[in-house]
């Protein structure tokens, strides 16, 4: 697979700082299990390399990254609420058994 360079990505994202932010957010998403958007992603590629490949291929933008982050936050909040609700039920069951 061809080597990806920062210059390839700068053709898509004009600002180096923005490129670093976009690539780091996407790499974190990929490391957490989000599926890559490029078909020929090598299993040996690290998340950072995959993120740069996606940027260079124009598969992602800030809107997509924000959308994925929002979905992950909502999922985490839902899981936290479910866990808290289960704890409340367990506490109620324990207090009933103490009576």
Curated annotation (Swiss-Prot):
Its EC number is 2.7.7.6. It catalyses: RNA(n) + a ribonucleoside 5'-triphosphate = RNA(n+1) + diphosphate. Pfam families: RNA_pol_Rpb6. SMART domains: RNA_pol_Rpb6. Keywords: DNA-directed RNA polymerase, Nucleotidyltransferase, Transcription, Transferase. Disulfide bonds: none annotated. InterPro entries: DNA-dir_RNA_pol_omega (IPR003716), Pol_omega/Rpo6/RPB6 (IPR006110), RPB6/omega-like_sf (IPR036161). Gene3D superfamilies: 3.90.940.10. One of its GO terms (biological process) is DNA-templated transcription. GO terms for molecular function: DNA binding; DNA-directed RNA polymerase activity. The keyword Oxidoreductase does not apply. GO terms for cellular component: DNA-directed RNA polymerase complex. The RNAP catalytic core consists of 2 alpha, 1 beta, 1 beta' and 1 omega subunit. When a sigma factor is associated with the core the holoenzyme is formed, which can initiate transcription. PANTHER family: DNA-DIRECTED RNA POLYMERASE SUBUNIT OMEGA. NCBIfam families: rpoZ (TIGR00690). Promotes RNA polymerase assembly. Latches the N- and C-terminal regions of the beta' subunit thereby facilitating its interaction with the beta and alpha subunits. Belongs to the RNA polymerase subunit omega family. This is DNA-directed RNA polymerase subunit omega. It comes from Xanthomonas oryzae pv. oryzae (strain KACC10331 / KXO85).
């Amino acid at each position: 697979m061809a080597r990806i360079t920062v210059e390839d990505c700068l053709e898509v994202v004009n600002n180096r700082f923005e490129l670093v932010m976009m690539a780091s957010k996407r790499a974190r998403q990929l490391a957490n299990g989000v599926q890559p958007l490029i078909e020929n992603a090598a299993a040996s590629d690290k998340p950072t390399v995959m993120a740069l490949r996606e940027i260079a291929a124009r598969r992602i933008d800030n809107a997509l990254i924000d959308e994925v982050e929002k979905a992950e936050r909502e999922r985490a909040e839902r899981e936290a609420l479910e866990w808290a609700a289960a704890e409340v039920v367990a506490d109620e069951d324990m207090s009933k058994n103490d009576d």
